[in-house]
Amino acid sequence: MAKRIITISREFGSGGRFIGEEVAKKLGIAYYDKNIIGQIAEKSGLSPEYIQENAELSPKKGLFAYAFSGRDITGKSVEDMVYEVQRNIILELAEKEPCVIIGRNADYILKDRDDVLNVFIHGDTPEKIQRITRLYNVEEQKAVKMMVDIDKRRMANYNFYTNQKWGKADNYTLCLNSSQLGYDRCEKIIMECI
């Protein structure tokens, strides 16, 4: 396997998490997503709930407030500390074993490695809304709000910590539209690229 590590960034509702999990199962490699949260919490001393809410997403306040609030004398915030712990864990996991890592800016964190396939999964809005309503058992209006809010926070976090644009094709090896290709085809394409 030329590419040992697969990172999957994704739009909310695109099925990126599901696709990544299926790829890991089919390849027989480790899968890291929310299971990283416990490690981050343990090493940072913060609660898993706090990590769940803040490790991949920017706080619910605006990007300006995110950039300047709650920083110590060195200029570091709690979010910066969490990001640094998360970064170190991702680097350790990449050294340890072949794996699929979902989100958490892993594509950027591992950008200097030659054995990484960076994938961005996106989808058509109607299909994403339909998937969110089904998975989370919410009305369409709530699904739209969830989709917009979560992607906005993912983008703010990614753009802030990487100085790159979230979802921009140049930042990834492969960009796949799960609505157009379907999950099975996305999985096959990813596996063909490693």
Question: What is each stretch, according to the model?
Answer:
Residues A41-P98:
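ATP-dependent small-molecule kinase phosphotransfer cores
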Residues P59-Y66, E139-D184:
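Small-molecule kinase domains that catalyze NTP-dependent phosphoryl transfer to phosphate-bearing small molecules
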